[in-house]
């Protein structure tokens, strides 16, 4: 009887991953709850990070439910982890301000959530009695740790997930389910002695490997800081970044390989984001902001914050011939 159940689990597990691939997710993997001992170490590391105040004003990071997926879905047994590539081989035009790549396309929260829900409905058709919950990064879940547990990649020293063939340019999501599924092997860290991301951070926000202090992070300050003015040390280091920051990913050797480009329509850049200028942003009012950022994750940055960030940013010099 046990063998029969295991065969059923295997077939369902493989079918579920194929269904996720049909939604454009790659890589995909499965982890069993409560996870391996390494997952428990990640949970303890989160508490140390919180104890040191590295979360800055992001109080939601301390949500107790983040420590146990079963607090998000009663009876949860398994986690389907998925990655969605957003890498497009494009660069901002000379003299323009920079926006983090994840924000170039459609709001990934909506994209990933909608696709996960379709997978969840498919799962309900296969197992009518099972429960499930779609989770994107707004959900209190140790999302990168569970993605690592499911074999999608390892957490790099810059705290982003790295896949050996796809680099770190991917957003992730999870489908919690009460269905017992077959787990994939956890990913193994391949950062070795590399310190490129630590060395490149202009504000030394990566305090030590795997520990990012949001209080020093350009991405945090351009997206989450609700103060009228940015701190002086952030203004001095901002450079041309106006929404997020990709420096630690740009220098990562795993992103210097020949990476597959996303042909997903939802991940393609809005052209104006690659030709964004200081003077233009400083004239934005609410209506312009609404028109430009409809359906974008960058709506997290309110109009006055765009103007504040643009005032502090300095475009890279235009190359001369």
Curated annotation (Swiss-Prot):
Name the reaction it catalyses.
epoxyqueuosine(34) in tRNA + AH2 = queuosine(34) in tRNA + A + H2O
Q: What is this protein called?
A: Epoxyqueuosine reductase
- GO biological-process terms attached to the record: queuosine biosynthetic process; tRNA modification
Native organism is: Synechococcus sp. (strain CC9605)
Function, in words: Catalyzes the conversion of epoxyqueuosine (oQ) to queuosine (Q), which is a hypermodified base found in the wobble positions of tRNA(Asp), tRNA(Asn), tRNA(His) and tRNA(Tyr).
Gene Ontology cellular component? cytoplasm
In the UniProt record, the signal sequence range is: none
Q: GO MF terms on file?
A: 4 iron, 4 sulfur cluster binding; epoxyqueuosine reductase activity; metal ion binding
Q: Which domain of life is it from?
A: Bacteria
């Amino acid at each position: 009887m046990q063998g029969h159940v295991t065969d059923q689990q295997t077939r369902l597990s493989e079918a579920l991953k194929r269904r996720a691939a049909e939604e454009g997710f790659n890589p995909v993997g499965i982890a069993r709850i409560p996870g391996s001992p390494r997952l428990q170490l990640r949970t303890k590391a989160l508490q140390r990070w919180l104890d040191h105040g590295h979360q800055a004003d992001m109080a939601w990071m301390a949500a107790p439910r983040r420590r146990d997926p079963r607090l998000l879905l009663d009876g949860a047994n398994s986690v389907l982890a998925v990655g969605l590539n957003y890498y497009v081989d494009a660069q901002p035009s000379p003299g323009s301000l920079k926006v983090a790549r994840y924000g170039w396309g459609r709001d990934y929260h909506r994209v990933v959530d909608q696709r996960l829900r379709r997978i969840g409905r498919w799962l309900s058709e296969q197992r009518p009695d099972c429960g499930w919950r779609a989770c994107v990064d707004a959900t209190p879940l140790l999302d990168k740790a569970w993605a690592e547990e499911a074999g999608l990649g390892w957490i790099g020293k810059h705290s982003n997930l790295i896949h050996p063939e796809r680099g770190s340019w991917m957003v992730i999501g999870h489908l919690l389910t009460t269905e017992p599924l077959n787990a994939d092997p956890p990913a193994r860290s391949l950062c070795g002695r590399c310190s490129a991301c630590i060395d490149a951070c202009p504000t030394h926000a990566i305090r030590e490997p795997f520990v990012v202090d949001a209080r020093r992070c350009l991405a945090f300050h351009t997206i989450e800081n609700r103060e009228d003015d940015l701190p002086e040390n952030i203004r001095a280091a901002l450079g041309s970044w106006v929404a997020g920051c990709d420096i630690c990913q740009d220098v990562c050797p795993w992103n210097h390989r020949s990476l597959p480009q996303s042909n997903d329509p939802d991940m393609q850049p809005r052209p104006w984001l690659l030709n964004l200028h200081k003077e233009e942003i400083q004239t934005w009012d609410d209506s312009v902001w609404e028109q430009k950022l409809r359906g974008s994750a960058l709506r997290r940055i309110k109009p006055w914050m765009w103007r504040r960030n643009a005032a502090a940013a300095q475009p890279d010099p235009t190359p001369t011939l």
